């Protein structure tokens, strides 16, 4: 019976072990936050401040293998409250890694696949989340025949993405959430915002997402206003000479465009109107063989035809090779089997997404503005989504019981001059939850040109106040008024500071533990000494009694015996002779404690301290 019982016991323990491991093995196919951790990013400069990053794919449509790629950067500081900014680029079908590595992210790419720090990064006071949206864009992927066709489908998939993202990273779910982007993201962002607000209405308070605001730069929001602005902008800037044959030809094309928009108002795309932009680019060709045209993203520059700006900005030639490196693909936790190489813009996504019958996002703004503030900003040198169109959009828009920036009948909100570090940066204008910012001397990609100014704009919009964390603010003024301190110059990285404080507390706890260990050793030594002393005392009492029983003759020899007791070479009382009472007070208590303490390591002064984040 004994062997059978032993076998049963072993089997039982084995079964228990399997049961204990079953939940973990069941979930092994599901990713955790740790699976998305970016452990090392190739090309980082030496001694660069540490930034916690996560990246990878999140599945949004299992039936079509639709996965959205994200890249998340933790904030450098926490001022007032926790914030997260989602950044989206346009296209449709252009990767948000443009924004990550050429605009608002913490790094810029240089030659030789090296990274440098962006001194105007938007993750200074907010976590940054870049998403390649929609599926098929950038590092995102989907089955070839399953590209999405409309804005509502895009928004639905994005909500699925956010649900899964916050399940993986619940620490960010309660953040103030801002959605930012540029160009065609002017269609994506309002649709996503509306989907979030609709979702919130069906959720408990604990499950809602706190949508703090929207920021759209040089946005394609109102196709009608923007399509009418190509020619207006070109004439105002002298790209096309007023009254010329070219101007008359373009005016005829504009009439065709206007007629199409009147027949089908509210659509997103009008091919008849896009032909006006193409014609302007064609008419501006100069040089040998007409091989140069204006850059449609920055009219101060020229580019080779027919690109006319598609080769810009100059950092683009570094971004592609960097993102295609095997080491980078591995660092960003990309599925190597699904990765076909990063593309800035996917023409297949663009071709499938451009649905002429979709309703433009401008129609969503009035209702969104009832609940959420919106900031529109424009670089003054952009043609394709120029500031003239944005300003027309605002003038024609009715929201919150008013139209345009009219605050009272016949009285419009003033354009307030904005200066940044002693230079005129542009102007601010705001009314009834809508803000408009014009950046002088800036292109379609404002943060590329002015990273620190754009970050100052973001901080003002989010109502960041650095007074609680210290540092030197930048000199940013609107109509001469400085306002809250919004840009940091010398504050310590709060996330890093928290880790250092935790490390210090751990050292203190270790010291306390070692100190208590020393006290225990001291008590043990004292007890041992007491026991040893008692033992010696008993032996001496025995020796005294023994001597009293001896003959007078033996007693007469006691001095010799006493002398012999102190003589360690005597063999008269071997047990007593082994102990000298003069050594009782010389038990090395302090020496013992000292050696005990020397065995402990309570901290090394040479431990490296984490570097401070560059401040602006």
From Swiss-Prot:
GO terms for biological process: apoptotic process; proteolysis. Disulfide bonds: none annotated. Pfam families: Peptidase_S10. Keywords: Apoptosis, Carboxypeptidase, Glycoprotein, Golgi apparatus, Hydrolase, Membrane, Protease, Signal, Transmembrane, Transmembrane helix. It catalyses: Preferential release of a C-terminal arginine or lysine residue. Glycans are attached at residues 119, 200, 357, 433, 441, 493. This is Pheromone-processing carboxypeptidase KEX1. Gene3D superfamilies: alpha/beta hydrolase. Belongs to the peptidase S10 family. InterPro entries: AB_hydrolase_fold (IPR029058), Peptidase_S10 (IPR001563), Ser_caboxypep_ser_AS (IPR018202). The keyword Cell inner membrane does not apply. Protease with a carboxypeptidase B-like function involved in the C-terminal processing of the lysine and arginine residues from protein precursors. Promotes cell fusion and is involved in the programmed cell death. Its EC number is 3.4.16.6. Residues 1-28 form the signal peptide. Residues 474-484 have a biased composition (Basic and acidic residues). The active site is at 183, 382, 444. GO terms for cellular component: membrane; trans-Golgi network.
């Amino acid at each position: 019976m004994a062997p059978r019982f032993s076998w049963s016991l072993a089997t039982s323990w084995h079964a228990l072990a399997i049961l204990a491991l079953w939940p973990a093995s069941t979930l092994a196919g599901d990713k955790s936050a740790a699976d998305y951790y970016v452990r090392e990013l190739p090309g980082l400069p030496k001694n660069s401040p540490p930034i916690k990053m996560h990246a990878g794919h999140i599945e949004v449509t299992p039936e079509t293998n639709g996965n959205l790629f994200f890249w998340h950067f933790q904030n450098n500081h926490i001022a007032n409250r926790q914030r997260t900014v989602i950044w989206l680029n346009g296209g449709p079908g252009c990767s948000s890694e443009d924004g990550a590595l050429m605009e608002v992210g913490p790094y810029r790419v240089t030659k030789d696949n090296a990274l440098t720090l962006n001194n105007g990064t938007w993750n200074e006071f907010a976590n940054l989340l870049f998403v390649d949206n929609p599926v098929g864009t950038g590092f995102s992927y989907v089955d070839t025949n399953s590209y999405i066709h409309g804005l509502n489908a895009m928004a639905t998939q994005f909500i699925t993405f956010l649900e899964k993202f916050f399940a993986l990273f619940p620490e960010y779910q309660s953040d103030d959430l801002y959605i930012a982007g540029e160009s065609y993201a002017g269609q994506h962002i309002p649709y996503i915002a509306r989907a979030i607000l609709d979702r919130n209405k069906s959720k408990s308070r604990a499950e809602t997402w706190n949508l703090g605001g929207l920021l759209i730069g040089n946005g394609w929001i109102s196709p009608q206003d923007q399509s009418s602005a190509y020619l207006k902008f070109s004439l105002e800037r002298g790209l096309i000479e007023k009254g010329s044959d070219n101007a008359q030809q373009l005016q005829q094309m504009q009439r065709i465009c206007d007629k199409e928009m009147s027949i089908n108002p509210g659509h997103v795309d009008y091919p008849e109107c896009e032909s006006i932009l193409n014609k302007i680019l064609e008419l501006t060709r100069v040089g040998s063989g007409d091989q140069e045209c204006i850059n449609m993203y920055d009219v101060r520059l020229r580019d080779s035809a027919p690109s006319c700006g598609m080769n810009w900005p100059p950092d683009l030639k570094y971004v592609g090779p960097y993102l295609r490196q095997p080491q980078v693909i591995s660092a960003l936790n990309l599925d190597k089997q699904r990765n076909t190489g990063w593309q800035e813009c996917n023409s297949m996504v663009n071709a499938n997404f451009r649905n002429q019958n979709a309703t433009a996002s401008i129609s969503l703004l009035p209702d969104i503005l009832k609940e959420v503030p919106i900031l529109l900003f424009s670089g003054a040198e952009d043609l394709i989504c120029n500031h003239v169109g944005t300003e027309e959009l605002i003038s024609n828009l009715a929201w919150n019981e008013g139209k345009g920036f009219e605050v009272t009948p016949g009285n419009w909100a003033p354009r307030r001059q904005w200066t940044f570090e002693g230079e005129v940066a542009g102007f601010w204008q705001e009314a009834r939850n809508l803000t408009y910012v014009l950046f002088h001397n800036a292109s379609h990609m404002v943060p590329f040109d002015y990273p620190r100014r754009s970050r100052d704009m973001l901080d003002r919009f989010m109502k960041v106040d650095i007074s609680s964390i210290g540092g030197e603010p930048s000199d940013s003024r609107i109509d001469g008024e400085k306002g809250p301190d919004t840009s940091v110059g010398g504050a310590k990285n709060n996330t890093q500071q928290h880790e250092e404080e935790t490390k210090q507390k751990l050292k203190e706890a270790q010291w306390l533990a070692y100190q208590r260990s020393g006290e225990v050793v001291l008590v043990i030594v004292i007890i041992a000494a007491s026991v040893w002393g008692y033992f010696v005392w008993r032996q001496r009492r025995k020796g005294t009694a023994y001597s009293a029983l001896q003959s007078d003759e033996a007693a007469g020899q006691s001095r010799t015996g006493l002398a012999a007791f102190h003589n360690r070479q005597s063999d008269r009382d071997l047990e007593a002779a082994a102990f000298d009472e003069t050594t009782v007070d010389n038990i090395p208590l302090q020496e013992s404690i000292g050696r005990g303490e020397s065995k402990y390591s309570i901290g090394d002064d040479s431990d490296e301290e984490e570097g401070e984040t560059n401040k602006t």
